[in-house]
Amino acid sequence: MSEARPSFQGPLWFIMDNLYIGKYANILMDRWFKRAFKEYGNARRLMLLFLQALIPEREIVSIDYASEESTNQNPDGRNIRVDVECCDSAGQRFVVEVQQSQQHFFYDRAVFNSTFSIQRQLQLGGDSYKFQPVYFIGIMRFSLHEGSDRFLYRYSLAEESTGEKMTDGLHYIFLEVPKCHLKADSSLVEKVGWALGNISSLDERPAELEGEIFDLLFSSANLSKFTPEDKIKYHNDMTTERDIRNQIQFARDKGLEEGMKQGMEKGMATGMEKGMEKGLEEGMATGIENMIESMRKNGIPEELIAKVQAECQKP
């Protein structure tokens, strides 16, 4: 088996890992996921194979992409953010997002984004509330269920005591990439999850990753096939992530230093153990606030700042 470089673990995994630029791009970054699964070469075929692997119970034979305008605007005219949305020949909708980091109200946000696909169907006319099933698929670069080894979670609307489905209209699938491993008995979905999370760390394609879906995945991530313009954009994106990583590390170091100082002072007056704990918390909070202010001054997008802030606030 071809081994990937060791991956970073913990709450900063989403920006600490895959900063090395080698043969393959990190396609879990938003712009490059969209390129691989919507824009480049046989992206339509790659997305189809991915959906077939995730949802084998549905006979998905072909897909079409929703327009950018309909995907990123809800019926009230407010903008929303979806990486890729498509539908199959039967009218089933698939909303696919890469989730970079855990955040407050994570599931609520998934429900919020999935319902717009339903509303757009009903706006087409008629007085019926019948709509085609919608699947929200979250590819997660973090572990939402830390105490479990499961990497794939499925949810639907059902009666609580019997499990009887209330409707076939809404489904949620979450793939926790960090929990995917490349083993002899790994399922196709687990292999895909592992490849998505580790492809930018590889110098060659592992023998275990055989088949058309991996042919297309590795082709789309091959940096030698990027246009000169895309190569520049990719390098800029990686540089931005490095800058953010360094800012976070500086903030944490500064916060720890301030926290130790405050902790010692409070410890003398209120008892060393409790004083140190409170001082560290306050110092870390100050360091994070300073980092966020610096990021805004340097023009870092608010969406990325929010992700970083959420990560820093984790224990």
Regions from the PLM with identified roles:
Residues 2-315:
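Elongated, amphipathic alpha-helical interaction scaffolds
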